[in-house]
Regions:
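Alpha/beta catalytic barrel-like cores
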Residues: 1-146, 163-164, 170, 174, ...
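Long, well-ordered mid-to-C-terminal structural blocks that present hydrophobic/aromatic surfaces
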Residues: 235-275, 280-283, 288-290, 296
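Active-site acidic/histidine proton-transfer and metal-coordination neighborhood
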Residues: 109-132, 136-247, 251-252
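Conserved, mostly hydrophobic/aromatic
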Residues: 17, 154, 255
Length: 411
């Protein structure tokens, strides 16, 4: 009797059908961020990374061209199980030789190579307007700027991106989540907190006035508590973004690195699901701030996935990864983070439904005991069976070292 068969029997004794769990897991889509591969540089500008974002490290092998980034992404797809989408920033527009369009002039054709890439691999595409690392970010402001020239530039960028998002959805046949995050804020205490937020709301209203198919395109806005150089005030606070999405009937997006370190997104998920049809998540690992460390199979990642599964909301939550580490092999960073999300999903799906009954009966003594027992159940055997069925190498690191020797080390 192999390890999986034994694990299957152990979980069956708890009322958990591991076959059903594996069938569910393989159909859960995770949107994979492209920017781990090149440290959030993109292809449309040469400005340094800005907007309170920072990558650290200088590990060799960074992708420097669209071809290299696509090749690296292929390696990630090969080494990770489950369904995936490609998540792009607008800064990853691909221009032909001699061609360039600024961010207020980008068009669908500048992403046609990404569409061809995604369609050849059966991937959908999610999208993010890029409101950072650009000379038109004036005094740290974009959509909330009091300078109408600046604000109009970024409103036009947002409108162009909405059209591109619909192009992605139509071409791939899969919905496109388009996420708006702006770095706007102030380093020190402002004299006026209201006006920038009013301008941000006005700008978003203008962007969303562009007609779009609400069954294909899902706009989100993402909050943040602070960033480097934006310590005192962030225009897109959690309260602003929550109220905006609720009054405009769009999708909230929570990044678990964008809150105060004592706040847990896992505790927020159930509340958001009660009052929204959909919810989007950016899954990362904050280390005292929004450091975007590689996602691990840690407590909070597991708790977030458990909250989604317990709410029977896998069909309502858009899952996406968002981290970037330049200090280690970037393929390994990508793959390890994705494996961690998949492991957390599996761990959540293997939780017995009977735990809810214990809570409702105020049987907290047994609830504690059963929850602790689950931690040493043969979860690993089920995970290994999942990898086997998905034709993923058990020792993915050996494959990463081979790719580093054959490809990355020669860049």
């Amino acid at each position: 009797m192999n390890a999986y068969t034994l694990a299957k029997e152990r979980y069956a004794a708890l009322g958990v059908d591991t076959e059903g769990v594996l069938n569910t897991l393989k159909d859960v889509t995770v949107s994979v961020h492209c920017w781990q591969g090149d440290d959030v540089v993109g292809f449309d500008a040469k400005e340094a990374l800005s907007g309170g974002i920072q990558t650290t490290g200088n590990y060799p092998g960074k992708a420097a061209t669209p071809e290299q980034l696509m090749a690296d992404f292929d390696e990630v797809l090969r080494l990770t199980p489950g369904k995936k989408k490609l998540n792009l920033h607008a800064s990853y527009a691909i221009f032909e030789d001699g061609e360039f369009a600024d961010r207020d002039a980008i068009r669908s054709k500048h992403f046609s190579r990404w569409v061809a890439y995604a369609k050849a691999r059966g991937l959908g595409i999610d999208f993010n307007p890029t409101f950072f690392s650009h000379s038109m970010v004036k005094d740290g402001l974009t959509l909330s700027s009091p300078d109408e020239t600046v604000r109009h530039f970024w409103v036009e960028h947002g409108k162009r991106c909405m059209a591109i998002a619909e192009y992605f959805a139509e071409e791939t046949g899969k919905p496109c989540v388009i996420n708006f995050w702006i770095p706007d804020g102030y380093k020190d205490y402002p004299a006026d907190r209201l006006s920038p937020r009013r301008r941000y709301a006005q700008s978003m209203d203008e962007i969303l006035s562009v007609p779009y198919d609400k069954t294909k395109v899902f706009p989100c806005i993402e909050s943040k508590v602070f960033g480097i150089g934006l310590e005192a005030y962030t225009v897109g606070s959690a309260e602003f973004c929550t109220n905006y999405v609720n009054t405009r009937h769009i999708t909230p997006l929570m990044d678990n690195g964008h809150y105060h370190p004592t706040e847990l997104v896992s505790d927020k998920i159930s509340s958001m699901l009660l009052f929204n049809d959909r919810l989007a998540l950016h899954i990362t690992r904050p280390m005292r701030w929004d450091s975007d460390h590689v996602v691990l199979f840690d407590d909070e990642t597991r708790e977030m996935m458990k909250e989604i599964v317990r709410a029977d909301a896998l069909g309502r939550v858009f899952l996406a990864t968002d981290y970037f580490d330049a200090s280690i092999n970037r393929i390994s960073a990508w793959v390890t983070g994705l494996h961690s999300v998949q492991k957390a999903l599996l761990y959540a799906l293997l939780e017995p439904k009977s735990l809810k009954k214990l809570q409702d009966e105020n049987n907290f003594t047994e609830l504690m005991v059963r929850q602790e027992e689950l931690k040493i159940m043969p979860f690993g055997a089920v995970w290994e069976e999942y990898l086997r069925r998905e034709n993923i190498p058990q020792d993915y690191f050996a494959e990463i070292k081979r790719y580093e020797a054959d490809v990355l080390s020669k860049r």
